[in-house]
From Swiss-Prot:
One of its GO terms (cellular component) is transcription elongation factor complex. Residues 1-21, 154-163 have a biased composition (Basic and acidic residues). It is found in: Nucleus; Chromosome. Keywords: Chromosome, Nucleus, SH2 domain, Transcription. Histone H3-H4 chaperone that plays a role in maintenance of chromatin structure during RNA polymerase II transcription elongation thereby repressing transcription initiation from cryptic promoters. Mediates the reassembly of nucleosomes onto the promoters of at least a selected set of genes during repression; the nucleosome reassembly is essential for transcriptional repression. Essential for viability. PANTHER family: TRANSCRIPTION ELONGATION FACTOR SPT6. The lineage of its organism: Eukaryota, Fungi, Dikarya, Ascomycota, Saccharomycotina. The keyword Transcription applies. The gene is SPT6. Gene3D superfamilies: RuvA domain 2-like, SH2 domain, Spt6, Death-like domain, Spt6, helix-hairpin-helix domain, Tex N-terminal region-like, YqgF/RNase H-like domain. Residues 36-62, 71-83, 98-110, 141-153, 164-177, 196-212, 268-285 have a biased composition (Acidic residues). This is Transcription elongation factor SPT6. It comes from the Eukaryota. Belongs to the SPT6 family.
Length: 1460
């Protein structure tokens, strides 16, 4: 495997999202200065080298190559076959072209035989072809044939798209086909229009060097030829002229690209004339110079346009491949798909069985042998035979279900899961094989890795990642060697991964790990076995510190000078890398992973933002205090975990995944793997060392496994929500057309009505009539007001006239607002009053129709193209009528963007776009294949053909290819066998789709004796079962075996089907058959399990393609309410508070309306007017909006009763639909937070109270930020006294230290006479004062004086911390042997100063903190009255600390001296 073939895999990186918090200015309560701000930072790894840092960017590419197998290649490799193209006379046409994916002769014979068809002989086939229009020629066919012509199968083989590039003369297309048929004038007219439109796509003069006159002449000639074509009539057998016209309009006539071909012909002729002599010479030398690059769509159109229309090279390959299109898309990027070893196939069966079994909820003692067999069969059908879900479920059901009647059946949901799991398994196997190859290249033998690859049950990607990380960690040097040996460049880069560990392992310190008494590999085996297979052996004489001391004093310690003065750092380093070895050990990780997956629970930890923002009505309300949630909880409510993840991404909460009693679990693992029972001091210290390393390692593994579980749980929950969305959408699709009379199941004539905005009298009412063929006939505009009290009969008569003229079987209605409900009731009243009945004498039903499709259609591009001159409401009504005829087709004609906008499931927003569309597509596939597609109807009905893409085996590309192939037939399809004989479908696609593509039986077709027209072509019976169906029919008719055998020899078994269809007692005869016994006999003789197929045969012989969908579902009750108002149970419920606009008054009652149009009634007892004994109109105003509480909802009349009383509005009722069981809800934390919220609410109330007024010249009515704004333009030392947010017993002083630097000082008041009075005792920083003036003089003015003293000192430097550090560093470089120190403001903590210093140029920069008090400067537990004393004290401290601590190990860390 070359490096280019291996795909790169990025290692997973865990990131800690930190929430940025903005806080209000804080009151400085730190009096003693013992809580100084810290700038401590973590030091660099002692084994990181500058050499690695310099090469980091360069080496990253090489390091990445090692991991590149962990993402499957997205680009499929494939070669392009060169086609041999030969010129032939323009007066001749090729006899026939063969497709790349066409069946060979043996396959064709076998398939035709299994399907019950008789394949025509070569002469018969030639005769058939002679009566048809010839196919369009390819560009390459214009080249001359050589003397020694190659076989036709090699020369004529080409892509179906080549038919677009025909160079044949236009007159040839008008040739008669022997039956007198020629293209219709109208159809050609439309085709020419399409061609003209395509001509505008690229301007002609950009591709031509001819002069203007020649160009005009050529265009005129082209136009003349087109006009000749328009003058000739056309008729296509079996299709009406209108249908032919529609077909031409949709598909064109194949001449859309003539302009490009004419251009190429002209250029090629010129080129051939100029080079004829050279070609002759080259031909004499045996060189074929006539080969030329064939013009392709890529040469004509922009790539983006080709992608949009699915015409790229990849798209064409998908069209040609004999694999279902959905499978091809799903398997994109998978190498060597379907080439698993027998062991891997068995492994896949068990792996998928375990996953599907969870959904089946089998009992613990259930025998899964038969279940696994069914899973294996399904995998074989999907992977080896490329059969789609719909086919498997319909015609292989006995292979995927239990033999017991009450046993399991793998339903469509399970089969779709198997399809996706199969792809995932192949990806895992590919990655496993990559890691194995990678490991073998290293030429090493590691017991852990060898054991993993010998264990055929290991299929989890996480375990595989452990092995890969382990090899990369432990054998970094070997990887480097392999990389170096495979690099041609002598200056190849190093393998960077774990290079610091390699340096540690090569150092003398590694000996200390050997002294621990047990290796990481032995620990892994102990943990895996759950007891000490390898006992720990303590060092007999040395403690950990002694072992390190010996190493540092030994002869190999010359490279360990950094540790010579700091043995503690050396011990910490050893512990760190020992913990790393433990955390990388696959057995340690696998044991913890197994235990975690069995026992993990999920808790939620709120952030301060989440505690504040998640309130009643929030989408995360039910998970705010989630606790102890198990996998079972998430399987029953998968949206819960997805919403947890969503809330975590918004920084509202953190998800914590752990096992219960995790500390005890860690103790248990340590005791069984690393702890010794010795009680000596040496053993205790080694136990302590090992325990610290073990805890560190397990914390890392816990974190990694928690993240793995989070990712796996997310994947599972997404799958379950996707399945739930799929079920909801299938409910919408699984509706038959509306049938008013079930006894006479005819598609109804439909009249649809809408009132638009519902302004009766000013806005017209629109009605649209559609016939039984779903064709728009005409629209009506009713201007009469249906609620006109003076002349109500005007509207009634107008509507009655329309109904009498159209004779509809059903009236459908809907609209955008609740006014539609009034119209609905009015129409029902008119139907009853006028006795408007159908041909059965029943009243014409008036129904509410779901309008979510109509709303999207009315303003769509499709509607504009179909009805460009019609108003929006007419288009809306047309879509309502189409929905009544077929909800399935209405949804199938929506674009992806329109489908994405549908509201299907309450949690669909949790899914990605891809998963949501996947759910919808699988729903379409299941229902469309349940219903089937009439082939000939699809060829001339673009609206109907939209569902073709969902037929088993098809997709967007193959359905388009299928329609193009049918178009080239130029006649209706008469039998399913023609799908094979005419090379329309390839073998696998035919097997998948044939039974779902039906051809209506027509006795007229019997005149074609060259085809075996079978009545079974109009049933759901698969062609492979035709022979079985004839035998069932013969048995039902009770023919004797000899007669059946005779018919079978004569090949006329289909006569039994005709006889049975004509038999009036066929139902009784078919139902009397013992199908179970027949199926058992069939399985015994042939090994085929066909019981389900036999049941299908019986049902289809009774009625072909019987309607299996659920009845049409008109809207009722709350569904109508939701459709007309847009309200749901979450936005409009009993007890909710809504805004109501007053419309009118009546008898002291108030009538209003909500924003969504719901009419509201407020009776006299539910508004304040009754209490005040005043009329409602004196208290409330018309047009004004008031808050109201919903008391009762009348869904039928789209109205409600509400209350305007204040005490009702204050008590809003929000229903709780979740459990607060203490086992899954953190009740204790909720109560604590509620107490905090109460205190905060009280403080906010205090803050909003009447502002205190203190009689003092410096007191101002400010908040903290307002005080800062006030002082911003004033001088240093200025201040204000203000009210404190801490309550009535606090005041605050805000004073200015420097530009944009302010300190807020808290004043606590004692001995208050009342809450608003000033306290007699005032406390600031534990110092008591008797009034504000004393605080100003003794406290504040002293601080201002000391502030001016330090800022005027030469050792004070203005600027930010970074600016001062840069100044000190620069100074130290210029004066390397001098110490330097400076003070500067601490802008993060007003009232504090930084003291930053360096001993010399080589030392680290240290940062201490100094606090400004009213008596001096506080540094390291001592207060210095002046700056001079502060500087002297600093130097004294520095000298004393230097004697005690000469080496500091923290970069830029004040902790090196006195912990600052």
């Amino acid at each position: 495997m070359s490096d280019k073939e291996d795909e790169k895999q990025s290692q997973p990186v865990l990131k800690d999202d930190k929430q940025d918090q903005t806080e209000e200015p804080a009151i400085d309560d730190n009096v003693n200065g013992d809580e100084g701000p810290s700038d401590e930072e973590e030091g660099d790894d002692v084994f990181d080298s500058s050499e690695e840092d310099e090469d980091l960017d360069n080496d990253e590419e090489e390091a990445q190559k090692v991991r590149e197998g962990f993402i499957v290649d997205d680009d499929e490799e494939g070669g392009e076959e060169d086609e041999v193209v030969k010129k032939k006379s323009r007066r001749k046409r090729r006899a026939r072209e063969e497709e790349n994916e066409a069946l060979d002769e043996d396959d064709l014979d076998l398939l035709m035989e299994n399907a019950g068809f008789k394949r025509p002989s070569a002469s018969e086939a030639a005769k058939q072809r002679s009566g048809k229009l010839k196919r369009l020629k390819r560009v390459g066919d214009d080249e001359e044939e050589s003397a020694s012509a190659e076989p036709e199968s090699e020369v004529a083989r080409t892509n179906k798209l080549d038919d677009f590039f025909s160079e044949e003369e236009e007159e040839e297309e008008l040739e008669d086909d022997g039956t007198g048929r020629a293209p219709s004038r109208k159809g050609v007219e439309k085709t020419v229009t399409l061609a003209d439109d395509m001509d505008d796509f690229i301007e002609e003069d950009e591709f031509s060097d001819e002069d203007e006159e020649a160009r005009k002449f050529r265009i005129a000639e082209k136009k003349r030829i087109k006009e000749q074509r328009l003058a000739q009539p056309t008729q296509i057998t079996g299709l009406s002229p209108d249908k032919v016209d529609e077909m031409f309009e949709v598909f064109g006539d194949g001449h859309d690209y003539d302009w490009a071909l004419e251009l190429e012909n002209e250029e090629e002729l010129d080129r051939l004339e100029e080079s004829s002599e050279n070609e002759q010479d080259e031909n004499e030398l045996g060189i074929d110079s006539k080969r030329k690059k064939k013009l392709t769509l890529q040469d004509i159109y922009d790539l983006q346009d080709l992608k949009k229309n699915l015409l790229t090279e990849e798209d064409m390959n998908i069209r040609k491949a004999d694999i279902p299109e959905r499978y091809q898309e799903l398997r994109t990027g998978l190498k060597n798909y379907g080439k698993l070893s027998p062991e891997d196939l068995e492994l896949e069966k068990n792996w998928i069985s375990d996953k599907i079994a969870v959904d089946k909820n089998f009992d613990a003692d259930y025998d899964t042998t038969e279940f696994k067999e069914a899973i294996g069969n399904a995998i074989n059908f999907i992977q080896q035979e490329n059969l789609e879900v719909s086919f498997i479920y319909a015609y292989r059901r006995n292979y995927i279900s239990s033999r017991s009647k009450d046993g399991f059946v793998l339903i469509e949901d399970d089969l779709w899961d198997i399809v996706f799991y199969d792809t995932e398994f192949h990806s895992i196997i590919y990655k496993r094989d990559y890691v194995k190859t990678f490991y073998e290249k290293l030429d090493i033998h590691d017991p852990i890795v060898d054991e993993y690859f010998s264990n055929q049950s290991m299929t989890e990607l996480n375990s595989l990642q452990d092995i890969y990380d382990y090899v990369e960690f432990k054998y970094a040097q070997e990887i480097n060697d392999v990389l170096l040996s495979t690099q041609q460049d002598a200056t190849s880069k190093k393998h960077l991964k774990n290079s610091s560990y390699e340096k540690f392992k090569a150092s003398a310190l590694y000996q200390a790990i050997n002294d621990t008494g047990i290796t990481a590999e032995q620990v892994g085996e102990n943990i895996s076995a759950e007891h000490q297979l390898h006992p720990v052996v303590d060092h007999p004489s040395l403690k950990p510190t002694d072992s390190v001391a010996n190493i540092l004093e030994g002869p190999e310690a010359k490279d360990l000078q950094i540790f010579s003065q700091n043995p503690k750092l050396a011990l910490e380093t050893i512990e760190k890398y020992y913990a790393l070895e433990l955390s990388k050990n696959p057995k340690v990780r696998q044991k913890i992973r197994d235990d975690f997956y069995k026992y993990y629970i999920v808790d939620v930890a709120l952030t301060s933002k989440g505690r504040k923002e998640i309130q009643r009505g929030s989408p995360y309300e039910d998970i705010k205090y989630a606790l102890g949630r198990t996998p079972a909880h998430f399987r029953s409510e998968p949206d819960v975990f997805l919403r947890m993840l969503e809330a975590e991404s918004l920084h509202l909460m953190n998800i914590q995944i752990h096992v219960s009693s995790q500390d005890q679990y860690t103790n248990h693992l340590f005791q069984t793997s690393l702890e010794t029972s010795n009680t000596s001091e040496i053993a205790s210290e080694w136990n302590s060392f090992r325990r610290d390393a073990f805890d560190s390692a397990l914390n890392k593994v816990f974190s990694d496994v928690s993240q793995e579980i989070k990712d796996e749980l997310k994947k599972t929950c997404l799958r379950l929500v996707t399945k739930s969305v799929r079920h909801q959408f299938m409910f919408k699709l699984d509706q038959a057309p509306f049938i008013p009379n079930p006894k006479d199941p005819k598609i109804p004539r439909v009249l649809t009505i809408t009132c638009g905005q519902g302004k009766f009298g000013s806005d017209a009412i629109i009605a649209v009539y559609l016939n039984r063929k779903t064709e728009f006939v005409r629209d009506y505009k009713i201007v009469e007001n249906p609620f006109d009290r003076k002349e109500p009969e005007l509207f009634e008569n107008a509507l009655d006239d329309i109904i009498q003229h159209c004779q509809p079987n059903v009236i459908g209605i809907n609209g955008p607002n609740p006014s539609t409900q009034r119209l609905y009731k009015k129409i029902q009243e008119i139907v009853q009053k006028k006795q408007i009945v159908d041909n059965r004498g029943s009243h014409v039903p008036v129904i509410y129709v779901e309008d979510e499709v109509a709303v999207r259609y009315q303003s769509s591009e499709r509607a504009a193209q179909e009805f460009p001159s019609k108003p929006t409401l007419v288009k809306y009504c047309i879509a309502l009528g189409r929905y009544i005829h077929s909800p399935l087709l209405e949804y199938a004609n929506l674009t992806n963007e329109e489908l994405l906008s549908l509201s299907i499931h309450s949690h669909q927003s949790l899914l990605t776009r891809e998963l949501f569309l996947q759910a919808l597509e699988t729903s379409f596939v299941d229902i469309v294949n349940l219903v089937g597609i009439e082939v000939n109807k699809a060829t001339d009905n673009h609206y109907y053909a939209k569902a073709l893409r969902y037929i088993a085996g098809f997709g967007r590309r193959k359905s388009a290819d299928f329609l193009e192939s049918l178009q080239r037939l130029n006649e209706p399809l008469l039998a399913r066998q023609q799908l094979i004989t005419h090379d329309i479908l390839t073998k696998t696609i035919f097997m998948n789709s044939a039974a779902f593509l039906y051809i209506s039986w027509n006795e007229k077709n019997q005149r074609y004796e060259d085809l075996e027209h079978d009545q079974l072509d109009g049933t759901r019976i698969h062609p492979e079962d035709y022979h079985l169906a004839t035998k069932v029919a013969a048995d039902a008719l009770e023919f004797d075996p000899d007669a059946i055998a005779e018919k079978e020899e004569q090949g006329t078994m289909s006569e039994f089907i005709e006889l049975l269809r004509e038999d009036p007692d066929r139902r009784t005869k078919l139902e009397s058959l013992n199908l179970e016994a027949y199926a058992e006999e069939l399985e015994k003789n042939t090994g085929q399990r066909k019981l389900n197929n036999l049941n299908t045969i019986v049902l289809e012989l009774l009625e072909g393609f019987e309607e299996l969908r659920n009845d049409f579902h008109p809207l009722h009750g709350d569904e109508v309410f939701k459709s007309l108002t847009g309200e749901s149970e979450k936005t409009f419920f009993k007890g909710c508070i809504i805004p109501v606009r007053v419309e009118r008054f009546r008898h002291n009652d108030i009538y209003g309306v909500t924003n969504s149009g719901v009419e509201c009634v407020i009776n006299a007892q539910r508004h304040i007017g009754a209490q005040l004994k005043r009329p409602a109109e004196e208290v409330y105003e018309i047009g004004k909006t008031y808050p109201a509480k919903v008391i009762y909802i009348d869904y039928d009349n789209i109205s409600c009763e509400v209350s305007l009383l204040e005490h009702d509005i204050r008590r809003q009722y929000v229903p709780i639909h979740y459990s607060k069981d203490p086992s899954i809800w953190n009740v204790e934390q909720e109560m604590k937070d509620q107490e905090i919220e109460k205190k905060l609410a009280l403080e906010e109330a205090r803050a909003k109270r009447t502002h205190r007024v203190i009689n003092h010249p410096y007191y101002g009515n400010f908040t903290g930020p307002q005080a800062e704004d006030y002082l911003r333009s004033r001088e240093r030392g200025d201040f204000v006294i203000r009210q404190s947010s801490r309550g009535d017993d606090h005041l605050a002083i805000t004073w200015k230290l420097d530009k944009d630097l302010f300190q807020h000082v808290d004043i606590l008041e004692k001995d208050k006479e009342n809450p608003l009075a000033l306290g007699k005792t005032l406390i600031v920083e534990d110092q008591k004062y008797h009034d504000l003036d004393q605080i100003i003089v003794e406290y504040l003015q002293n601080k201002v004086r000391l502030l001016n003293e330090i800022t005027s000192n030469e050792k004070f430097k203005k600027g930010t911390k970074k600016e001062v550090i840069k100044f000190i560093e620069d100074y130290s470089k210029v004066n390397p042997n001098r110490s330097v120190y400076y003070f500067s403001f601490n802008y993060e903590h007003p009232g504090w100063f930084y003291l930053m210093f360096k001993i010399n140029a080589q030392s680290q920069l240290y940062v201490w903190n100094v606090k400004l008090t009213h008596t001096g400067f506080f540094l390291v537990n001592y207060n210095y009255p002046t700056v001079i004393q502060l500087c002297n004290g600093f130097k004294t401290l520095l000298k004393s600390s230097s004697r005690n601590k000469t080496q500091d190990n923290n970069n830029n860390n004040s902790g090196g001296y006195y912990g600052y």
